[in-house]
Amino acid sequence: MSETDSTDFHEMREPRIEKVVVHMGVGQGGVELQNAETILEAITGQQTVRTKAKSPEPEFGLRQGDPIGAKVTLRDDTAVDFLERALPAADLDRRQFDNTGNVSFGIEEHTDFPSQEYDPNIGIYGMDVTVNLTRPGYRVAKRDQGTRQIPSNHRLNSEDAVSFLVSNFDVEVNE
């Protein structure tokens, strides 16, 4: 192995996708929530989980525990496949990346996906996508026994996340 190879690349420094969470907040149960769940299952290919109101909001007629949305968590190859379809429909901006290497973006219409067509009986739904990036070795901060902090030089930052998405998914990030 040459000297330049050892300084440019190390397998423990390579970012990877831990998970992708796709969320649709409808604000109420009933037919709208069922439509959102159907759309999410069709786009992601996985079963949805309902999200519930954490606190009562009388102004909106919500009680604690009322179903108000649906979400799907994708990992491994399904997360990569979903991002390959979702990122062309999104306009990424530098401020959508946080300091720990995560990115969140919205897709305004579910019809932006190639597999989805407009159905007047359902309408148009938008969704929020959150991508969580990690590096190998992050488990030491999450394990039950012997937890340690991740060293600052090993933590992901927004520049690492931007370069990962640009190089692996060929997206353009606006300044």
Curated annotation (Swiss-Prot):
Residues passing through the membrane, by range: none
Claim: Ribonucleoprotein is one of the keywords in the record: yes
Keywords annotated in UniProt: Ribonucleoprotein, Ribosomal protein, RNA-binding, rRNA-binding, tRNA-binding
Gene Ontology terms, MF aspect: RNA binding; rRNA binding; structural constituent of ribosome; tRNA binding
InterPro entries reported for this sequence: Ribosomal_uL5, Ribosomal_uL5_arc, Ribosomal_uL5_C, Ribosomal_uL5_dom_sf, Ribosomal_uL5_N
GO biological-process terms attached to the record: translation
Superkingdom as given in the UniProt entry: Archaea
Annotated GO CC locations: cytosolic large ribosomal subunit
Assembly and binders: Part of the 50S ribosomal subunit; contacts the 5S rRNA and probably tRNA. Forms a bridge to the 30S subunit in the 70S ribosome.
Family: Belongs to the universal ribosomal protein uL5 family.
HAMAP family xrefs: Ribosomal_uL5_A
Entries under NCBIfam families matching the protein: PRK04219.1
Known function: This is one of the proteins that bind and probably mediate the attachment of the 5S RNA into the large ribosomal subunit, where it forms part of the central protuberance. In the 70S ribosome it contacts protein S13 of the 30S subunit (bridge B1b), connecting the 2 subunits; this bridge is implicated in subunit movement. May contact the P site tRNA; the 5S rRNA and some of its associated proteins might help stabilize positioning of ribosome-bound tRNAs.
The protein's name: Large ribosomal subunit protein uL5
